Amino acid sequence: MYPKDTDIRVLIGCAPCQPFSSYSHKYQNNENTLKKKDLLDYFGKQIELVKPDIVSMENVPQMQSREVFHRFQDILEKNGYKVTYKVVYAPDYGVPQKRKRLLLLASKFGDISLLGPEFSPDNYPTLRDTIGNLPEIRAGETYVQDPLHRSRNLSALNLKRIRQSKPGGTWRDWDKDLLLEAYKKESGKSFGSVYGRLEWDKPANTITTQFPGIGNGRFGHPEQDRALSLREGALLQTFPLNYEFVDPKQGRNYPISQVALQIGNAVPPKLGEIIGKSIINHLEELDEF
């Protein structure tokens, strides 16, 4: 797996978060999701087989209370690793979305820790900082110079709904004839962010694989009558502006859901960068002794 001349062997894994996420609670008992629960155990077996010097893992905060996570810790500790884990708030590390993630680091060389936050509430990156300069597009339109700056079309009814939605508001801002039946019930209170618009001067809500649809969360553009474009979702995940998720030869001929799956399932590159810098810092500290 590693070249023979490798000095330090690092293994990084991220089991699918759906079995542990509160967002996907309704899917947690379907067959595909149940199979994914075993993947952290599989990662533990690979660690025992490969014997890397350093291990890292990322997932949703809910995982830390699950038995599979405790088994994973036990495997690491029994194999001589010093383990540390922490729930981080993504804006603290330059990710412009209200995302909390569980980050784990483990080393055979000794104690290892995650680098401290780089941002604070007074300078968190905001939605405006991240997507404010992108060209305006309509629902269902693709910007001619960037095939990824593409927004899903809206039905006439959903267009009326988003036009009555306010940044940071809820479906309670709508006229009664626009309400879904579910929202008229007491249980409808739990749908507060659905069909909502984001706010310019705050970090965005967590980007999921469903962000191109306004009915899936607070994914409405603050001003334009549409959901976030694929490019906007990618930028909020901290991918570079020129990052390509599809073969350029495809142009605009690709399913929006296919690309949204890649974007929403990704570890934000800036969080990945922090993990990498933390590992480098750990190794540099070892060299000083």
Predicted regions located by residue number:
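Class I S-adenosyl-L-methionine
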Residues: 1-8, 18-194
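Hydrophobic beta-strand segment of the Class I
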Residues: 11-12
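C-terminal target-recognition/interaction regions appended to catalytic cores
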Residues: 153-289
